[in-house]
Amino acid sequence: MEPAFWDASALVPLCVQQIATPSAQAAGKIYSVVVWWATPVEIRSAMARLVRMSLLTPNQHVGAQARLAELRSKWHEISPDPSLRDQAERLLDRFTLKAADALQLAAALAWTSGRPRARAFISRDAQLLEAARQLGFQDLRI
């Protein structure tokens, strides 16, 4: 399986049944998962929001957490460090990104050693995908 950097927005549909779940599952058959260190926090935040909005029952939440644990056991995680933070700050000057998205994109760049050409970046966030594309990633929207 070819590795790809997955944004949290692309992983939530692998944990919770959503419209994007079939697309995420198809991508999961082609690409292994590389993530930023804080991705589990972002996914858990999305799950908690769905519970609060009554879009996810407590039983579904338990199942989603189990699916997240399974994903985590297989993915490769990029750890934070000062150079990654510095890169994220530079990305904020160049692109219209939220702080967490800049950190994700900086982690993706660290994963590719600054050579993203033709490496897949998977997300549901159009702004983040556009920034990734401009940096040279192959952007895959699910």
Predicted regions span which residues?
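Short, well-structured N-terminal submotif of metal-dependent ribonuclease cores
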Residues: 1-40, 50-63, 137
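Alpha-helix capping/helix-boundary segments
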Residues: 10-11, 39, 84, 104, ...
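Acidic catalytic patch
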Residues: 69-95, 102-107
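Short glycine/serine- and small hydrophobic-enriched flexible loop segments
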Residues: 45-52, 109-110
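Acidic, PIN/NYN-like endoribonuclease modules and their adjacent C-terminal/linker elements
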Residues: 2-3, 106, 110-142
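Short beta-strand scaffold positions
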Residues: 6, 35, 79, 99-102, ...
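Short active-site oxyanion
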Residues: 1-2, 30-33, 74-76, 115-120
